[in-house]
Amino acid sequence: MFVDIYDQLYISYAAVVSTLGIIFNGFLLFLIFFKSPSCLTPYTVFLANTSITQLGYCICFLLTVPRVISINLRIVNIYLGFSQFLGHWWSYMIFTTMLHFAVNSFLSIMLSMVFRCISLKTLRFPTSGAFAMCILAYMIPLSMVVSIRGIEITSNFTINSKYTLWQLENLDKYRTVVGTTMAQLSTLWVACCVSILCIPIYSVMFWCRYRILRMLERPGYMFNTTTTLQIKRLVKALTVQSLIPVFTLFPASLIFLSTQFHVIETTKFGYIIISLLSLSPTIDPLVTIYYVQPYRKYIVDLLWSEERPMVSPFLSNNDPRFYRSRSNSVLMMRNTHFV
């Protein structure tokens, strides 16, 4: 198996980032399933959906460690991970599965914001509704995997060298190199989902954020100051999560599109595209653990067992405002778990 010094650095990076992502998301799933208050059930569906998706992404990244050469409507992937021993088709399938996990993770963050917007209007949100939203949204990334069943790929050295404009040295020494073109609808659809789809997703997220803040600022709104403050903090947490792709997914998509449409004609970004994309699954679970109070409290108690249990300074069960209405009290309990 041939690897140069840059490949070795990239493999080391992939091993560290993927391993941390698997550990963080695995631990977050433990917290979701065993340390979540029952009143958070609808929201934990979205948390679990995001975490499971990101865990799957990290596993696929570790298996493939793809070096993506994107240039002039051609894509050539050099697989440096274990999947190279599984053959060309399986390597490309796992790679596409990895991309579909990335898209579903982004969609799941959007659904969390949509959930908050809807729940503020209705004051009730069934768990079945959360599952239905996740399943319906998953149809988009699932179509990415289904669409490549009949894709035409090549492992021919001469063709792949032409695809990369003969700019890659030692291409013939790699065990598994897969090339394809954007002329195929399946490849075009996958590329659009990873790049262009980000625009409507972000539009929905920030429209929901705008609507939530407008509702909370409306005079005479039914929630008291405490609940309003907690909801704003939850919105802040979701906003922070939605900003992570700005520094990971968006630059990766921009580089990919720039190389595809002749803005940049170089193979030097082969390591960067997936490297940027792979930061989100590692950072996002840490953001979730920090902002969800029961999870953060569990970490604090685990590390400093002598500390007293954290008590929210904003809301007490003895506060009569807590019992303003049954629907309102449930929503208040949900929001007090976000700080």
UniProtKB/Swiss-Prot annotation:
Signal peptide annotation: none
Bilayer-crossing regions: 14-34, 45-65, 94-114, 128-148, 188-208, 237-257, 269-289
Locations listed in the record: Membrane
GO CC annotation: membrane
Pfam family, one: 7TM_GPCR_Srd
Domain of life: Eukaryota
Membrane topology category: Multi-pass membrane protein
InterPro entries: 7TM_GPCR_serpentine_rcpt_Srd, Nematode_rcpt-like_delta
Record keywords, A-Z: Membrane, Transmembrane, Transmembrane helix
SUPFAM superfamilies given in the database record: Family A G protein-coupled receptor-like (SSF81321)
Family to which this protein belongs: Belongs to the nematode receptor-like protein srd family.
PANTHER family associated with the record: SERPENTINE RECEPTOR CLASS DELTA-32, SERPENTINE RECEPTOR, CLASS D DELTA
Protein name: Serpentine receptor class delta-32
Organism: Caenorhabditis elegans
Gene transcribed to yield this protein: srd-32
